[in-house]
A protein has these predicted regions:
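Acidic/polar surface patches and capping/hinge elements
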Residues: 1-133
Length: 133
């Protein structure tokens, strides 16, 4: 997906994050790992009710959330089917470019996701991270 030609970006690498993710044995990684583990745990007592509500909101499929939002905008503000189609086309082109850019970064940095990191915390070479399989 990261090698697909974007619709509006010059190239898929244009939005690649910099600097790269922190090294697994760095203090920054250790801090972030432990924060995500504490806040992201299913029964976390470190997370506020507002943080839980926000996490549940964003746990929905991104594209489903995006389309639902576009539908709400179109229904509330657009009477013409052509203008509505244009809104959906442009917004989904932007969405596709974001996904292309994200996959480019995933492939380039080859870095694991938080869920995998936390499950494999005992195997990451960092003595200050404890896995939670």
């Amino acid at each position: 997906m990261g090698e697909v030609r974007p619709f509006t970006l010059r190239e898929s690498t244009q939005l690649r994050p910099s600097p790269p993710p922190p090294r697994l044995n760095s203090g920054e990684y250790t801090h972030d790992y432990n924060e995500v583990k504490a806040l992201g745990s299913l029964n976390s007592t470190a997370r506020t009710p507002d943080q839980t509500a926000l996490a549940l909101f964003y746990s929905d499929n991104f594209l489903t959330l995006w389309e639902r939002t576009l539908r709400g905008i179109a229904n509330a503000n657009i009477d013409n089917i052509g203008d509505s189609a244009r809104l959906f086309a442009l917004a989904n082109m932007a969405s596709a470019d974001a996904i292309i850019g994200a996959w480019d970064a995933k492939k380039y940095y080859n870095y694991w996701r938080p869920i995998t990191a936390i499950q494999e915390g005992n195997n990451d070479g960092n003595k200050d991270t404890v896995g939670d399989p």
